[in-house]
Amino acid sequence: NKGDVVLHQVTFLEGWTFKQVMDAIKTEPEIKHLLADKSDAKRLEILNLPISHPEGWFFPDTYRFSRGTSDVEILTQAYNAMRKNLDELWANKSANLPYRNDYEALIMASIIEKETGHEGERDKIAGVFVRRLQIGMPLQTDPTVIYGMGDAYRGKISRDDLKRPTSYNTYTIQGLPPTPIAIPGKASLYAVLH
């Protein structure tokens, strides 16, 4: 019918990095692109969200939009969805977890998301990592090493890579890396908070 609004959609998947989210947005011709050729710092400035790093903050889901909707509007919607899910789960978290704040839980959830895609393993892996944090043991998880390698990662991790200190190498650092390494889904958020 005339007057019906045609809806388009863009999907962000669990485990994606912010770069992958932006790549998905860039491929949608019906989106008004305000962020495409900007640095992450400039994108954050334009988004005007209360975050200092974009990684992990945009909830994985399918977002429907009409032609001319901006990438800023879609990312704001995805941020609000992550914030809502994180707030709800944080408010009902288990006692005695080693996180100082919900951002640390988001970081841990991103690690769980990259560590396994199997539903039944999330709780077990989260339990192992929580115990390691509680006793001050390094997390020792390959996905953080891979993230820290950036474009240098070519499909394999060497022993040297595991020893090379980066702020994301959980073989060489104590505790959590400084930011999430991907966008976690609700199941990973739940696993690290229960």
Positions of the model-derived regions?
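Glycine-rich loop/hinge motif
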Residues: 2-30, 95-102
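Bacterial extracytoplasmic/cell-wall-associated proteins, especially those involved in peptidoglycan
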Residues: 29-31, 44-194
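Short, well-structured active-site flanking segments
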Residues: 32-40
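Short, flexible domain-boundary/linker segments around small modular repeats
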Residues: 1-4, 42-45
